Amino acid sequence: AHYVNNGNGRTEVATAVEFDSNGSALNTLTAWKALADAGVAPNVGRGGDAGLADFSAGKSAMTLGSTASLKQILTDVNGAFEVGTAYFPSVTEGDKGGVSIGGASLWALESGDEAKKAATWEFVKFLVSAESQAYWNAQTGYFPITTKAHDEKVFKDNIAQFPQFQTAIDQLHDSAPEYAGALLSVFPEARQIVETE
């Protein structure tokens, strides 16, 4: 289900949310409450650090999180138990589910200085290179932004040693386009409202 109208803001500018009327918010919150009521999804606080720490210490059987946490989890667990990964679950039975990418944005601001502009562009090219992206993925779990990174030795070696990294990549490629996420210019304000009201 879409988060906002107009094809999740991809066919035209989003003008209204849909999650409050299409059942997706209610389904998600109902499922989440059922897990909490059953005692299998405790409230470990705001943010993800406490949940990740509990999982890494063997205090919980599973955790939901960003792929960006995977390397840290594997490091923290340090072989004390097997860390498995799976596709992100769907809420509604029969729903294929999917994932979207986000975070780790790279921005370059116009300063009017041509030398800085040229240096910034060289730095951006370095960061988005297949070699840098393969290393970044292996060290963090973040998705490489280019599939050319998959051809790099560091990427292949990491997948061979930690096949858990492949799960998120596979699910991203298996996700339908509507899971790419909503384009909504007021997302920062909307998040703040959800968090505070």
Where are each of the predicted segments found?
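Short helix-initiation/N-cap motifs at beta->coil->alpha
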Residues: 43-57
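Glycine-centered hinge/linker elements that transmit conformational signals in sensory
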Residues: 6-45
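Paired acidic/hydrophobic, glycine-rich loop segments that form the ligand-binding mouth/hinge
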Residues: 61-66, 84
